[in-house]
Amino acid sequence: MSERNTLFSRPLPIALFILVALVADQAIKYLVEAFLPFQEAVPVVPMLALYRTYNYGVAFSMLSGMEGWFIVGMRLAVVAFVLWLWRRTPKDRFFAHLGYAMIIAGALGNLVDRLLFGYVIDYILFHTATWSFAVFNLADSFITVGAGAIILDELLQTKKTRSLKL
């Protein structure tokens, strides 16, 4: 039985997706830098504000005390590892391939910031009157949704494998 190629199992569609996602991420960050005040909440809807800040670490400002080149190297290693996973994953696993593309796009989006500025531009803030979530950006969202797509793919694959055994 041969594998059915999915859209993101082929190099050109995945490269185009990553490029479009990267351009969108950088364009939004450019607008954030140009028009949002620094560390001042701009309410959008209840519980959501735009809030420009800089992240010198990785997710949730972890490793913010580490040398910038260490973080750049770590991000490049993540991209290389995800590319390796993408190449080894069966071609019919749509959500896994979509997830890999999203993770690569997000990692590259934040890597561009790190290389250009020495920090990552964050600007999305979820909050209530007594609590607020970490400030993040579109690239972070790509990484999170991409990881979710891979988990979904694994769950679907497990269900498919179980039904084949019955």
UniProtKB/Swiss-Prot annotation:
GO terms for biological process: proteolysis. Signal peptide: none annotated. InterPro entries: Peptidase_A8 (IPR001872). One of its GO terms (cellular component) is plasma membrane. It is a multi-pass membrane protein. One of its GO terms (molecular function) is aspartic-type endopeptidase activity. The active site is at residues 122, 140. The keyword Ribonucleoprotein does not apply. Keywords: Aspartyl protease, Cell inner membrane, Cell membrane, Hydrolase, Membrane, Protease, Transmembrane, Transmembrane helix. It is found in: Cell inner membrane. The chain crosses the membrane at residues 12-32, 66-86, 101-121, 132-152. The keyword Cell membrane applies. It comes from the Bacteria. Pfam families: Peptidase_A8. This protein specifically catalyzes the removal of signal peptides from prolipoproteins. Belongs to the peptidase A8 family. This is Lipoprotein signal peptidase. It comes from Sinorhizobium fredii (strain NBRC 101917 / NGR234).
